[in-house]
Amino acid sequence: MALPKLNTPTYELEVPSTDEKIKYRPFLVKEEKILLMAMESKDNAQIIQAVKDIVKSCTFDKVDVSSMPMFDMEYIFLNIRAKSVGEVSKLKILCPDDKKTYADVDLDLTEVSVQVGDDHTNKIELTDDMGVIMTY
């Protein structure tokens, strides 16, 4: 007799750059271990790869993380983390005035959003006759 398969809850969010709705699930213990090992290595490439792998698996392989803007991936990861570990993250913020004092701050991850200015454009002028158009 096979063991029953446990289902994890699924949630939905809107990707900031495309307004596309995607489904996601909280990360599991194995994915949290991958993230913790990457963080312990202090290697940025490993951390980014771990986040990409977690976003890909927690969105049921429906998101192409290799071509996605980094701000979208970070937004999706924050939502996954909020549902997995807790919606409030405790931070210690260095006082910008004296650069010595730390303040404890609770950050509600569900209230984090991508901010786009009114004058934002996907075109970046490099010179008068050369530029780059971002694909997001």
Where are these predicted regions, by residue range?
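Short, surface-exposed, charged amphipathic helix/loop patches that serve as local interaction elements
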Residues: 1-136
